[in-house]
């Protein structure tokens, strides 16, 4: 198992193709839905709860696909994409820990938006604090997270939940 503590864009894309942690590990989305350019740090003993943390980044430029359609003459990154990135990172964490199966977002306790990501921004930073992981018949990760744009916190989410399933046909 790869226990590196940082990952570049090529490695994240490899995760989306099942080539980073193995063909049965949870996968990240690829292409436009991959909302992460790099994982700066990942560990299993840091963070607010001492159970792990992830810091990841997305470079922002005015040419990103969502600025052309959300909204015409009022471009802003959809808040749901930042939230999805947080779920992506919880699923990645479970794969990094060795979980096998297909990752699925299961919910979130509370989400707050107090700002926006505009085309003139330079960088989005995601900071996740792992609260709990379960590795039994049920594999699940729970985390709290914030999103910063150019160093200013604009989103927060509590109790982000991602499960990993061997069979999603009846989910």
UniProtKB/Swiss-Prot annotation:
Pathway: Lipid metabolism; fatty acid biosynthesis. The active site is at 70. Pfam families: FabA (PF07977). InterPro entries: FabA, FabA_FabZ, HotDog_dom_sf. GO terms for cellular component: cytoplasm. It is found in: Cytoplasm. GO terms for molecular function: (3R)-hydroxyacyl-[acyl-carrier-protein] dehydratase activity; trans-2-decenoyl-acyl-carrier-protein isomerase activity. It catalyses: a (3R)-hydroxyacyl-[ACP] = a (2E)-enoyl-[ACP] + H2O; (3R)-hydroxydecanoyl-[ACP] = (2E)-decenoyl-[ACP] + H2O; (2E)-decenoyl-[ACP] = (3Z)-decenoyl-[ACP]. Disulfide bonds: none annotated. GO terms for biological process: unsaturated fatty acid biosynthetic process. Homodimer. Belongs to the thioester dehydratase family. FabA subfamily. This is 3-hydroxydecanoyl-[acyl-carrier-protein] dehydratase. It comes from Shewanella sp. (strain W3-18-1). The gene is fabA.
